[in-house]
């Protein structure tokens, strides 16, 4: 282009390229904070608020019209009215059409604004003025994260279905399906987000420190000691770190080596543990030679340089989804022993192996005791959980060369074109949707039922805690993780060994089955069924029939547990509606007291059990005959 006496060279660019160019031109303004992404993020979160708060009876939208199986709702608030269309599914789940949502005030449609909706619902939420600002900050952070994903994650579901493990990890867009404020990450700044958020897929190095043994708890599986583990994990750096200590005049055998999250070192340890550093009880060693990628759980890392090496999980003192994400040194002292006990139980019962159910053991753990906080504070506190880490088995040694991995959370993933990864995975497998679901239930539900009925043992079976092993898209094995903090034995009839006493949980008998009905049915299957219904040939009714069939088949295989099947009836008419968002709204600093897990629970009446329709099937038999069409 000629401009008077000057000549300018112009290069056209596409809309997709604009965020990158904008970021380069304005490095202090996140490129994803653009109107179209922000509006889309708000529409997404408003949809989720309407869905989940209706499910938890916080709001009660009214049907004003019905047509072709679709309900048209209105929600009248003080200064505005929301309108939307949705299909009503089992477990009081509204599958809302995002494009149908609109809000009207004084006869004028207004932009959808998740923050505004939360404020309009403030009285119904019952949140204190002390906690509300932090919750609003978490909502904003969740919107920020969603806008980033909209701008940077456009991998089609069909591509993800064939992708490698870490591409899928970074490609997830939702987080926990129930919680509204599920990407709070209070403590991260803009640069931290790009460096440490799972969706950024950044490659990073861990900080390594030496911690004096008499201030630290180290525990490991039998036959594994600190030096053997760290030589395996650090390689030549182990010797380099020992030499560094010697050069400082320190005896290397007086210290353990500990990995630390880079953010945690910079923001917490270097300052809060300044006295320990000054006294030489904590010594900075340097960064890892190996490179890592953060996982969906945000404080766990997979080793990219050597994927066969351990996962590393570190304390991270950010507020995220109802907890400060620390790790307790007290818990670290017995975590490997708990893992060994659970693994021995699982491996001694052939049923688990037959179903393809495997434990990823936490093989070692370490925690530094800050004596001032431990002396000053008698109650549980995030200040006593700032400097701990653990090593967990990598999933890679558990798979064959042709097999792939993805967390079970991926089964709920929907891409920007509303295409479900689950549907793409079924297509890739070559199986019918019904056969795929049956195999999945055998891997996932059957072992969890067996743990519950045979051993009173429960896991935390949400999507991020389970890793599916796939062979050309076919589920063949399932890997359960996060054992030390999440496993419990409920009202167990047998005494537990002293080192695993922490697993014992006493609760009201009628609440025990909630670990299946809430954690699996309400928090996983409630979302899975509509995806199958909309994007595969398995209808919602057929899905729940397959679940019922799985339960009956399990019962038929274990008639000696008949008394327990009767006592904990999975086919009962209804179960208590446990409200996870209400729990977070009650205390978004610490949702659950691990010393008393039931204390902070919130309920809203009963919810109809989808399996109740199959109660009339003959005892402990398969429901297959009932479901077969008449000839």
UniProtKB/Swiss-Prot annotation:
Q: Give the EC number(s) listed in the UniProt record.
A: 6.3.2.63
What modulates its activity?
Requires Mg(2+) for activity.
Q: Which domain of life is it from?
A: Bacteria
Q: Which GO terms describe its biological process?
A: siderophore biosynthetic process
Q: What class of enzyme is it?
A: ligase
Keyword Cytoplasm: yes or no? no
Q: InterPro entries, from UniProt?
A: Aerobactin_biosyn_IucA/IucC_N (IPR007310), IucA/IucC-like_C (IPR022770), LucA/IucC-like (IPR037455)
Which keywords appear in this protein's UniProt record, sorted alphabetically?
ATP-binding, Ligase, Magnesium, Nucleotide-binding
- Pathway(s) where this gene product acts: Siderophore biosynthesis
Q: What reaction does this catalyse?
A: 2 N-(3-carboxypropanoyl)-N-hydroxyputrescine + 2 ATP = putrebactin + 2 AMP + 2 diphosphate + 2 H(+); 2 N-(3-carboxypropanoyl)-N-hydroxyputrescine + ATP = pre-putrebactin + AMP + diphosphate + H(+); pre-putrebactin + ATP = putrebactin + AMP + diphosphate + H(+)
- Entry keyword Metal-binding: no
Q: Which GO terms describe its molecular function?
A: acid-amino acid ligase activity; ATP binding
Function per UniProt? Ligase involved in the biosynthesis of the siderophore putrebactin. Catalyzes the ATP-dependent head-to-tail dimerization of N-hydroxy-N-succinyl-putrescine (HSP) to give pre-putrebactin and subsequent macrocyclization of pre-putrebactin to give putrebactin.
| The protein's assembly and partners | Homodimer.
Q: Family, per the entry?
A: Belongs to the IucA/IucC family.
- Return the protein name: Putrebactin synthase
UniProt organism field: Shewanella sp. (strain MR-7)
Query: Lineage of the source organism?
Result: Bacteria, Pseudomonadati, Pseudomonadota, Gammaproteobacteria, Alteromonadales
């Amino acid at each position: 282009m000629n401009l008077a006496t000057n000549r300018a060279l112009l290069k056209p660019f596409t809309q997709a390229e604009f965020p990158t160019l904008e970021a380069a031109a304005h490095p202090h303004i996140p490129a994803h904070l653009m109107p179209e992404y922000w509006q889309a993020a708000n529409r997404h979160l408003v949809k989720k608020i309407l869905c989940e708060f209706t499910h938890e009876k916080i709001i009660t939208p009214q049907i004003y019209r019905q047509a072709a199986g679709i309900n048209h709702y209105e929600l009248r608030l003080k200064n505005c009215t929301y309108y939307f269309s949705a299909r009503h599914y089992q477990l009081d789940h509204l599958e809302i059409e995002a494009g149908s949502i609109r809000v009207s005030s004084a006869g004028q449609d207004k932009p959808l604004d998740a923050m505004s909706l939360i404020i309009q619902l403030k009285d119904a939420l019952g949140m204190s003025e002390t906690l509300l600002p932090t919750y609003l900050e978490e909502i904003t952070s969740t919107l920020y994260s969603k806008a980033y994903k909209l701008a940077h994650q456009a991998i089609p579901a069909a591509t993800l279905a064939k992708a490698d493990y870490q591409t899928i990890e970074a490609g997830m867009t939702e987080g926990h399906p129930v919680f509204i404020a599920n990407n709070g990450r209070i403590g991260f700044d803009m640069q931290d987000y790009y460096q440490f958020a799972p969706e950024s897929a950044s490659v990073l190095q861990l900080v390594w420190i030496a911690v004096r043994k008499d201030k630290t708890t180290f525990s490991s599986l039998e036959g594994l000691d600190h030096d053997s583990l760290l030589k395996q994990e650090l390689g030549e750096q182990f010797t380099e770190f020992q030499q560094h200590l010697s050069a400082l005049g320190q005896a290397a055998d007086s210290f353990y080596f500990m990995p630390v999250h880079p953010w945690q070192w910079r923001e917490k340890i270097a300052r809060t543990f300044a006295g320990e550093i000054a006294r030489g009880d904590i010594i900075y060693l340097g960064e890892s030679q190996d490179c890592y990628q953060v996982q969906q759980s945000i404080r766990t890392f997979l080793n990219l340089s050597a994927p066969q090496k351990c996962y590393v999980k570190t304390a991270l003192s950010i507020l995220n989804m109802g907890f400060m994400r620390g790790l307790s040194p007290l818990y670290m002292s017995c975590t490997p022993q708990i893992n060994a006990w659970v693994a021995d139980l699982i491996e001694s019962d052939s049923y688990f192996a037959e179903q393809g159910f495997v434990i990823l053991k936490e093989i070692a753990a370490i925690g530094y005791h800050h004596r001032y906080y431990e002396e000053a504070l008698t109650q549980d506190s995030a200040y006593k959980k700032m400097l701990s880490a653990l090593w967990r088995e990598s999933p890679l040694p558990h798979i064959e060369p042709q097999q792939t991995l993805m967390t079970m959370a991926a089964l709920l993933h929907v891409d920007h074109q509303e295409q479900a990864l689950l549907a793409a995975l079924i297509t890739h497998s070559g199986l019918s949707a019904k056969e795929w679901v049956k195999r999945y239930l055998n891997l996932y539900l059957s072992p969890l039922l067996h743990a519950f009925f045979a051993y009173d043992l429960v896991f935390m079976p949400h999507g991020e805690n389970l890793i599916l092993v796939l062979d050309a898209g076919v589920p063949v094995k399932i890997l359960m993780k996060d054992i030390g903090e999440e496993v419990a034995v409920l009202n167990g009839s047998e005494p537990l060994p002293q080192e695993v006493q922490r697993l014992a949980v006493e609760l009201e008998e009628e609440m025990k089955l909630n670990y299946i009905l809430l954690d699996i049915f309400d928090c996983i299957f409630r979302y899975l069924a509509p995806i199958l219904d909309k994007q595969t040939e398995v209808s919602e009714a057929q899905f729940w029939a397959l679940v019922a069939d799985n339960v009956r088949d399990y019962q038929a295989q274990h008639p000696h547990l008949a008394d327990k099947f009767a006592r904990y009836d999975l086919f009962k008419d209804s179960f208590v509606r446990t409200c996870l968002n209400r729990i977070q709204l009650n205390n978004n600093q610490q949702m659950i007291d691990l010393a008393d897990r039931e204390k902070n629970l919130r309920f809203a009446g009963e919810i109809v059990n989808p399996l109740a329709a199959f109660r009339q099937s003959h005892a402990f038999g398969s429901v297959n005959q009932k479901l077969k069409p008449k000839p």
